[in-house]
Amino acid sequence: MNTLNEKNNKVFISGEILTEAEFSHEVYGEGFYEMTVMVKRLSGQGDILPLTVSERLIEDRNLKPGVFINALGQFRSYNKLVDGKSKLMLTVFVRELLDEPRKNPNNIVLSGYICKPPVYRTTPFNREIADILIAVNRSYNKSDYIPCIAWGRNARFAKTLSVGEKIAVAGRIQSREYQKKFSEDDIKTLTAYEVSISKLAAADNADYFDIDEEFDMMGAVSGRTEDADGERYQNKFN
């Protein structure tokens, strides 16, 4: 196993389980289950995030709705056929459960490569944002494709990045509801999952970005990524 790839993608979340575990798949005789967890923001709002957990962890910790968990893992993607079309699915793959929470209940750091041209735009409230899709290498020659959103001056910086450039980011995972119109009478409310970036580094700077150090630092500061959509934390790594 490539331990360097294991460091490219680190997540910590702390929250309340909302749903019963549902069987997802089996690998070498070990079953994996899906559930959702609500992670509270400082504002009181919550991000409802999908988790994938092994049956061993579920049995050891008696994971069920209402239980609070502190989970370390990775943010992973996979393709799923939905109505005959391939859809990118995202989940927090839990590697370890901790007894104690961290001050920051929602913390992610990633290192990967730009795989689509960033899309820069201004919202109706005059906020600058940029959508970025990052390919993060995983062991066994796999990759996870993680949608991210940058704000303010990070968004302006992101729009200058090219496909193939290396990038490192830190922030939080957020859920966001949106409406999609399939026909005049068919409008559905869907949920998107993405990384809200509070810090980013690109090109040579990304090579010197210590994932472990940044992950520990982000977890030690309460609410560090809460205001990622403002200018307060829009700084790049040096």
Feature locations, PLM:
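N-terminal intrinsically disordered, low-complexity, charge/repeat-rich segments that act as generic
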Residues: 16, 51-57, 69-73
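Hydrophobic beta-strand-centered segment that forms part of the acyl-chain substrate-binding groove
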Residues: 89-93, 149-150, 173
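Conserved beta-strand and immediately adjacent loop positions that scaffold enzyme active sites
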Residues: 34
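Acidic, gly/ser/pro-rich intrinsically disordered tails
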Residues: 1-14, 21-31, 40-49, 58-62, ...
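Flexible glycine-rich surface loops and low-complexity tracts that mediate binding to linear polymers
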Residues: 67-80, 165-178
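Short, structured interface segments
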Residues: 68, 72-101
